[in-house]
From Swiss-Prot:
Protein name: Methanethiol oxidase
PANTHER family noted in UniProt: METHANETHIOL OXIDASE (PTHR23300:SF0)
Function, in words: Catalyzes the oxidation of methanethiol, an organosulfur compound known to be produced in substantial amounts by gut bacteria. Selenium-binding protein which may be involved in the sensing of reactive xenobiotics in the cytoplasm. May be involved in intra-Golgi protein transport.
Positions of post-translational Phosphoserine modification: 467
Phylogenetic classification of the source organism: Eukaryota, Metazoa, Chordata, Craniata, Vertebrata
The gene coding this protein: SELENBP1
Pathway: Organosulfur degradation
Length: 472
């Protein structure tokens, strides 16, 4: 196992070896103040998740960024399991690309894991000048030792799905990963699978469209994404565009963790479905819808029909289970994907959402539920918002969940989330029969933060997790 290997690099030799890794004791997650009314910088929170610790389920450290209104969002590592064979590499820095300001913060989490400190700031001017890219999202480490970050647009806020390359040691901006002029029309997330010489990227919308909130008219105008882009991994060129039937706003994308696998899943937020992409015999790629969450007919909401809004998806390291969150409907789901063409629902839990009893929304017609779910109260705190970002323990038995999506959309869809702050919850997972159960003893209430209620987002463990590492 990698942790006992004197000559190995970061992470684990395989996803199945990673499942035997140590239990997580810390979680790092960005907390956002943009759009909350609190004039304070976003910060990286460190949460103690060791049940034996006296500080269990508490924020034990906060690292504020030096600027206001960055909109920290996702994070990634300087190096990970893609460099397992290189003993000169070690996972020491967490990179925090900013969705709005386009800064990249490099945080040292190795010197003192319980009290991270800022190592370097990559300013947007350098990224604009060298890449003509902006509005940064997903960060993945590469086997080359570089770090690759996806962009949603150009510095003027137009759609542009390109990729920034940073040196993994100095964090200097090296330029774009894609060939000059070869960016996709829009961008968001990406995942690569070198054994099949492929990368696939997704798209949200142009920054100018989504920055200040959601306008349904923009959907009608075709301004939101519904494509996957297939790239030649070695040539850095876009080779195929897949149009997603019913697949509006494809966000998070996950190949199966097995590096030999030639298929994976993407969650389509507004389409409220999961689509499977796969390689054909001729080497091209196709996509098919495998799960559809039906909308609910409602009264008292901005539209007469409420989509579930699938905002995050995750695969267990053994590729047995798919998890996803329905941010508006309020449920988190577990599917058995032993047969990836026919996912089977085996677990479901409601964690707030827009259709709870006693709320402003009345459900008129529901293809799935007989009655509206009860509001979620944990340790006396009524949970605002719905389940959003998720992270799974390496062994697959614990899910961590946060409730904020993106500050401008939080403000629009869940105003109480802005007033009361988001939460972090922990769900126990049955990996034998399937099933999800809330841990009633775990709650991190970001409504009680020292500077005011904060919006906590993506979750990371110090040693890598189920969405940070890619195996070769």
């Amino acid at each position: 196992m990698a942790t006992k290997c004197g000559k190995c690099g970061p992470g684990y030799p395989s996803p199945l070896e990673a499942m035997k890794g140590p239990r997580e004791e810390l979680v790092y997650l960005p907390c956002i103040y943009r759009n909350t009314g609190t004039e304070a910088p976003d910060y990286l929170a460190t949460v103690d998740v060791n049940p034996k610790s006296p500080q269990y389920s508490q924020v034990i450290h906060r690292l504020p960024m030096p600027n206001l209104k960055d909109e920290l969002h996702h994070s990634g590592w300087n190096t990970c399991s893609s460099c397992f064979g290189d003993s000169t590499k070690s996972r020491t820095k967490l990179l925090l690309p900013s969705l709005i300001s386009s800064r990249v913060y490099v945080v040292d989490v190795a010197t003192e894991p319980r009290a991270p400190k800022l190592h370097k700031v990559v300013e947007p001017e350098e990224i604009h000048a060298k890449c003509d890219l902006s509005y940064l999202h997903t960060s993945h480490c590469l086997a080359s030792g570089e770090v690759m970050i996806s962009a949603l647009g150009d510095p003027r806020g137009n759609g542009k799905g390109g990729f920034v390359l940073l040196d993994g040691e100095t964090f200097e901006v090296k330029g774009t990963w894609e060939q000059p002029g070869g960016a996709a029309p829009m961008g968001y997330d990406f995942w690569y699978q070198p054994r099949h010489n492929v990368m696939i990227s997704t798209e949200w919308a142009a920054p100018n469209v989504l920055r200040d909130g959601f306008n349904p008219a923009d959907v009608e105008a075709g301004l939101y994404g519904q494509h996957l882009y297939v790239w030649d991994w070695q040539r850095h060129e876009r080779v195929q565009t897949l149009t997603l039937q019913d697949g509006l706003i494809p966000l998070e994308i996950r190949f199966l963790h097995n590096p030999a696998a030639d298929q994976g899943f993407v969650g389509c937020a507004l389409g409220s479905n999961i689509q499977r992409f796969y390689k054909n015999q001729g080497g091209t790629w196709s996509v098919e819808k495998v799960i559809q969450v039906p909308p609910k007919k409602v009264k008292g909401w901005i539209l007469p029909e409420m989509p579930s809004l699938i905002t995050d998806i995750l695969l267990s390291l053994d590729d047995r289970f798919l998890y996803f969150s329905n941010w508006l409907h309020g449920d988190l789901r577990q599917y058995d994907i032993s047969d990836p063409k026919r996912p089977r629902l085996v677990g479901q839990i409601f964690l707030g959402g827009s259709i709870v009893k006693g709320g402003p929304v009345q459900v008129l017609e529901d293809q799935e539920l007989k009655c509206q779910p009860e509001p979620l109260v944990v340790k006396g705190k009524r949970v605002a918002g719905g389940p959003q970002m998720i992270q799974l323990s390496l062994d697959g038995t614990r899910l961590y969940v946060t409730t904020s999506l993106y500050s401008a959309w939080d403000k629009q869809f869940y105003p109480d989330l802005i007033r009361e702050g988001s939460v972090m919850l922990q769900i126990d997972v049955d990996t034998v029969r399937g099933g999800l159960k809330l841990n009633p003893n775990f709650l991190v209430d970001f409504g009680k933060e020292p500077l005011g209620p904060a919006l906590a987002h993506e979750l990371r463990y110090p040693g890598g997790d189920c969405s940070s590492d890619i195996w070769l």
